[in-house]
Amino acid sequence: MKSVEEQLALIKRGADELLVEAELVEKLKRGQPLRIKAGFDPTAPDLHLGHTVLINKLRQFQDLGHQVIFLIGDFTGMIGDPSGKSATRPPLTREQVLDYAETYKSQVFKILDPAKTEVAFNSTWMDKLSPADFIRLSSQYTVARMLERDDFDKRYKSNQSIAIHEFLYPLVQGYDSVALKADVELGGTDQKFNLLMGRELQRAYGQEPQCILTMPLLEGLDGVKKMSKSLGNYVGIQEAPGIMYSKLVSIPDSLMWRYFELLSFRSMEEINGLRADCEAGANPRDIKIKLAEELVARFHGEEAAATAHRSAGNRMKEGELPDDLPEISVAAIEDMPISAVLNKAGLVKNAAVARDLLASGGVRIDGEVVDRSFIVKLGATHVCQAGKKAFGRITLVSDESSK
């Protein structure tokens, strides 16, 4: 096992906040594997790279010799996490949650070592709690303290409804830490309230409180809003290798170091070396290719990564992407057909030219040929090629003034 200092450096890599660092140091000094918990509510079947920020950190803990608990919130998934929500979230059925959970497991083991991972379902202990147990759990926290949470506070002050079951969510997530005897819990920055709840409940139930490590929410391909499938600015880990590769190679230069730190398993020394190369004049696209190859290989294998790289090179033979790819924002109030986007972005002379190019296979989005049925989602960013010489990284931005 590495020294405490070496472990701490890797644990803190890319992290937003570690509470309480001195407590974690004491836990590490004992020289025993720690129990590292991260919970995931399976609310959708497919994961994207934003979800993997936490999973990557779990893998780093595994590599340091600690015990990782991948907690599937099949019970909490039926409540619906209210974190950051402005309205009550509709609950899922048990069948939906279990179906999604199976797809999660097949995806996360592309990152985690199955032999070193304990998969747990919080229904295992939550289904066994009696009404009296639930009342005891609820008595550990007050409504006033719940309303200190930013999203609840905003809804309360604006006279929006807050259902009682939403107050239960952070209590149940906190109780998961009691049931699992967690030493450390990971979560996104939007989960801090829930993670701190785990510390408080562990104290209330006579346990040593867990440390918490919050990780940032990964920006999507637009480099602005958090990665989200609904915004169209995501990279799905089950997307075809070529699409994943093309999306990653086309991210803004300003975003690539953030992606390296949070998504790559390269050491920070190696990443800093790449940064120095870039500052010395290396083409940023060549650096992004290294990131794209690494991530495609992780989820699809080395051969698929090599094929994606070759295919991307072949696709660009007749129209090499310029180093100074123009950034173009197109205002819209809703999703828009690609023909209209190309026209508004100025990549074609008029709508008729756009239709002709689409019909003849002359339009590529993120390196892939598309037809007139392709719809650009509001908030999405794509590298677009119209014909042989017209290129642009186009973002469909919300035109609030038109609403």
Swiss-Prot record:
* Organism this protein belongs to: Pseudomonas syringae pv. tomato (strain ATCC BAA-871 / DC3000)
Q: Which residues bind ATP?
A: K229
Biological role? Catalyzes the attachment of tyrosine to tRNA(Tyr) in a two-step reaction: tyrosine is first activated by ATP to form Tyr-AMP and then transferred to the acceptor end of tRNA(Tyr).
The answer to whether the entry has keyword Membrane is no
Q: What is this protein called?
A: Tyrosine--tRNA ligase
Reactions it catalyzes:
tRNA(Tyr) + L-tyrosine + ATP = L-tyrosyl-tRNA(Tyr) + AMP + diphosphate + H(+)
Q: What gene, per UniProt, encodes this protein?
A: tyrS
* PANTHER family from the UniProt entry: TYROSINE--TRNA LIGASE (PTHR11766:SF1), TYROSYL-TRNA SYNTHETASE (PTHR11766)
Q: Which SUPFAM superfamilies match?
A: Alpha-L RNA-binding motif (SSF55174), Nucleotidylyl transferase (SSF52374)
Subcellular compartments:
Cytoplasm
Name the CDD domains on file.
S4 (cd00165), TyrRS_core (cd00805)
EC code: 6.1.1.1
